[in-house]
Amino acid sequence: MRGLLGRSKLGADEGLLLKPGGSVHTFFMRFPIDVVFVDRDGQVTRVVRDLAPWRVAGSRRARAVLELPAGSCARVEIAPGTRLSFID
């Protein structure tokens, strides 16, 4: 899976949902991202803000990972305990 590799940026309202997933890396990425780890019930278990290129992050309880532009979690107030829902 390539994820965001090769992209130069994300739009302010764009993101990538990786499902299933419990960890991410930013090897070869060109920009920092916010990473939201979500459990099977849609509850946020961990938030990593401004994850720089060449880093790794994970959450054992996560079943999905949402990658967002850096600053998005602060802007829309996503924090551990927030419940998210996704529409397929």
What are these regions (language model features)?
Residues 1-88:
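Compact, glycine-rich, soluble single-domain proteins
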